[in-house]
Amino acid sequence: MKYAVKMPKVLQAVYPKRLWSINTADKVVYLTFDDGPIPEVTPWVMDTLANFNAKATFFCIGDNVRKHPDIFEQLIARGHRVSNHTMHHVKGWKTPLVAYLREVDSCQNLMELEAGQEIHKLFRPPYGQLRSKQAKALQKKGFQVVMWDVLSADFDTALTPEACTKHVIDNAQAGSIVVFHDSKKAWPRLKLALPEVLKYFSEKGFAFKCIP
């Protein structure tokens, strides 16, 4: 499995309209969680974040919102940001433009229906896969495409929790957007890595905020 834990600057420069990190001098890290909400993991994530007075951005799969609206509503009630991760976690490189936009719109409409309010238009493409035409069409619809600059790689079953923790501690800095997953696949690594990351950066004087 090939991926970059620290997103190369050259790749960020190629796609400057995508959000890779937040330009700030403040000691803030932006934690993000992909693929929820699910009852097995997401409530624990919320409780763990609360122990450190931390807020985060959750990129939700629409079908999981449909299945677990109560957990989705808890995310909003507890001050986290909920954002779009398509309806069914589709791959951008294999999905035609019209079908891809339908996936995004369906997720956005469902979230707004469940929330009873407008949802800020942040979008993260599943697997990080997004064609230029898809990105341009989403931007025309008012979406900010959010990528990341640090990957915990908690999805990688070959890794130990300690390795995932080290990925974040060694690479995150002020303004970093960090990826975790509130999924059953990531859980064996997430349950140990997330508290350690929160503890480490809290002791360094960092705060954890939602992506604005």
Language model regions located:
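Active-site beta->alpha N-cap acidic-glycine motif
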Residues: 2-93, 99, 106, 110
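C-terminal domain-boundary segment and adjacent tail
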Residues: 14-24, 51-53, 66, 188-212
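Structural detector of well-ordered beta-strand residues that form the stable sheet scaffold
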Residues: 30, 57-59, 83, 124, ...
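Conserved strand-to-helix beginnings and helix N-cap segments that scaffold or border functional pockets
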Residues: 42-43, 69, 97, 135, ...
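CE4/NodB-like, metal-dependent polysaccharide N-deacetylase domain
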Residues: 46-55, 81, 97-129, 136-140, ...
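Short histidine/acidic/glycine/proline-rich micro-motifs that form metal-
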Residues: 60-65, 88-91, 128-129, 151-155, ...
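Charged helix-capping and loop-helix junction motifs
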Residues: 73, 100-104, 159-166, 191-195
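His/Asp/Glu-enriched short active-site or ligand-binding loop at hydrolase and phosphoryl-transfer sites
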Residues: 129, 134-171, 205-212
